[in-house]
Amino acid sequence: ILCYVTMVDGQVKEMGDYYIDGVAFPAEEILLEFAEPVDPSEELFPTGNLVDDLEVPGIGTFKATMITAGIPTIFLNAADIGYKGTELQADINSDTEALARFEKIRSYGALKMGLISDLSEAETRQHTPKIAFVAPKSDFTTSSGKEVKADEIDLHVRALSMQKLHHAMMGTASVAIGVAACVEGTLVNLAAGGGEKSAVEFGHPSGTLKVGAVIKKENGKYIVDKATMSRSARIIMKGEV
């Protein structure tokens, strides 16, 4: 990971006006470049397809993009699972049936991605894959009550982590979003309007985030040179003697 950090008189510049939705206060922007965010021994799309039909007994068959960049992630269309893509935590985390449905879909996705060899292993592999759903852009209201207009974003993304809808978006999942958005034909790319892209701004429960990627195709294989996103500088701990 390459971090571009602003320095002043040999010290990190912490104060700034860059604001990440979901973080309590603004700070100096730090640009991150995730060099080769896909393990060379792994396929970016482990099934070999940009979009698969994911069969989940008792629930249905869903179009899914399964990707390993950043963190293994399963992307679904929000409309296919009965959502708009503008949902907040309270809309999903209090619905035990919905959470169980997401977990079953995630388990079958893990099996199809080759991350597990038996469905029973999914219970002890909660960290990956993540499951997320996407939708075309529209006006929405964040968890803090902020109004975001459709023309401020390219698409909506909501993601679950450890069987709960995340309050914003996980950093590693943001890498997956950025890479998937920049590959023509994935569900993420199509939700953002399709076509060639180098970056997208997506809406999440706490606001918006811009992510991107540099990708090339060699001998039929997608190669991710880097994924990009910004974070903010902030003091985690300070001690004085």
Describe each region flagged by the PLM.
Residues 1-241:
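Non-transmembrane, aqueous-exposed alpha-helical and coiled segments at domain scale
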